[in-house]
Structure formats: structure tokens, C-alpha cells
Amino acid sequence: MATGQKLMRAIRVFEFGGPEVLKLQSDVVVPAPQSHQVLIKVHACGVNPVETYIRSGTYSRKPALPYTPGSDVAGIIESVGDGVSAFKKGDRVFCFSTVSGGYAEFALSADNTTYPLPETLDFRQGAALGIPYFTACRALFHSARARAGESVLVHGASGGVGLATCQIARAHGLKVLGTAGSEEGKKLVLQNGAHEVFNHKEANYIDKIKTSAGDKGVDVIIEMLANKNLSNDLKLLSCGGRVIVVGCRGSIEINPRDTMAKETSIIGVSLFSSTKEEFQQFAGILQAGIEKGWVKPVIGSEYPLEKAAQAHEDIIHSSGKMGKMILLL
């Protein structure tokens, strides 16, 4: 290590595996921004389920080892690289796709995936914007092509992506149904845009959804746990209805005939398949929502950086998650 290099704390992964492979190191060199990059002093970083899949080595996208996890950060610009004109040192920002990893005291981000963080939102809320809200936008408008007047069922609506989906869908004129695993979770979902919420732990909750949807069925289902719900989802859809798969933790057997009579679709979502133009569209939706006040990130569990392994354990195994999980730095 060269003399004079600035060091930081960061979580590093040297091998794929369980949460225990997340190692806190205090001698990681602070990266320098290259052309069209910014260096962010991280105040908060979001924790997303996909980061546990990547860490385990079971995800389609495998980073080169060692690496630092994390995509969503909010903080203050520390320095900027050549060609950056939109930001300067001291600016409050959030980003959804770090270059160097977000579980760290400093993170690099491309200037075109970095956005101003309004004073109306704190850093924790800023770290809850990126992946949840951009994923919700892609699921609703790119994958489902949802339209005002349609109905949408959001499974796992009390989590980060679920709440973002409810807020966005309600603001765009959809009838919003949600599921949650507790009375507290149901209340939170109602407060964030849903017209009606069902407890997915109740044995007859599917029947209650059918009653609410009526003979037509549900136009769009945003599915956070396809390996559990997909078969039932297909029975809830309207003619031409769409199941949008945002999350899945295993396999499931379905009957393809359930898609035929009503000509329904199952569509997967991959946020990072979005084009630059699509990301700009999603950012515009968020900006409008922030200005109008309906984008309201809800924060759930908070952990210090050194508890990242516990956060990964909890985000997968804790039932009835509410809000966005955050690492505080």
C-alpha cells in the first residue's frame, strides 16, 4: 500500500457463501473517481434481498472476488472525476448502482446513476429510494404496462419494494390490493396507498382476494415470492392479466393450462436490464413523486456496518418485514 493512501471501513466478500462471508475490514483503500464518476461519503446504504443471492453465489450475476456488496447509498459528494458537471463536493445525493460497492464508508458511482437528494428526505430515506422505487417503476410500467383504472395486487406489500409499488400505483390511478403478514404490516400498507390489504398468514386469504377482485379478477400481480405464490396467482388473474415476478427463492410447479383460458402472462423483472432512457424515465417518475409528496420511503430495521451479516440473515428469515432495511454509517 502506497504511503498517504486514505483508508476506510468496508464489508468485503472473499468467497461465496452464507452471511458469515461478509467480513468487515478497516484497511480498505478509498477509491478515486475516474472519468464521469463521483465519490460519495456514505451516510446510509440500503440492504436488498438480491444482495443475499449474489453473496451466496446462486445469482446469475457473479461479481469478481473479492467485492463489496451494496447498490443503494445516500450521502455527500466527496470528490468528482473528470467530465462531471452536474455535481460538486458537498452535494447531497443518492444512487442506485455503485461502482465499488455500498457497504462502505465511501462509494464510487457513475454520474448518470447519481441523483440530487432533496432536503425533504434524510439520508436513510435516500438510501431507500434506488432499488425499491426503480424496481417498482420497471415492474409496473415496463413489464406490466399497467394503466390507470386497472387493479394491481402487491404481494409482500409491507417491504421496501412493496411499499414503493403501492405508492406509485396509487398515484397513477390503479386500484391497489396488498398482502402483509401482520396487523401492523396491513396498517402500514394502507397508509402507503393500498385500498385493501389481506393477511397472507390467514388460511382463506386467497378467497378474500377473489371476493374483492370480483368476477373479473386482478389485472396485475407484483410477486415478491414466486416460488410460494405463483400457482395461486394464475388463478387470481383477469383475462390478459400479468404476473410480474420481482422475487423468487426457489422452484415451483405450475399448470400451464392456468395461463391458457384467460391468455395470461408471467413476466420476470431484471432492473439492470433497463436502458439508460428507461432509467431516466424512472428517475422522472420519482422526481415528480418527491415534489408532489407521494414518494415517502419507509425505513424498517437499521444496523451499523459491522452488523451487515445479521442484516443479511434477517432480511431473508424474518417474517413480516416492514419498510426498507438500512445500514447506517
UniProtKB/Swiss-Prot annotation:
InterPro entries named among the record's database cross-references: ADH-like_C, ADH-like_N, GroES-like_sf, NAD(P)-bd_dom_sf, PKS_ER, Quin_OxRdtase/zeta-crystal_CS, Zinc-ADH_QOR/CCCR
Pfam families: ADH_N, ADH_zinc_N
Origin: domain of life: Eukaryota
MF-aspect GO terms: identical protein binding; mRNA 3'-UTR binding; NADPH binding; NADPH:quinone reductase activity; zinc ion binding
Residues reported in the UniProt entry to bind NADP(+): 53, 158-161, 181, 200, 229, 246-249, 269-271
One of the record's GO cellular component terms: cytosol
One BP term from GO: protein homotetramerization
Sites bearing N6-acetyllysine, chain numbering: K23
Protein name: Quinone oxidoreductase
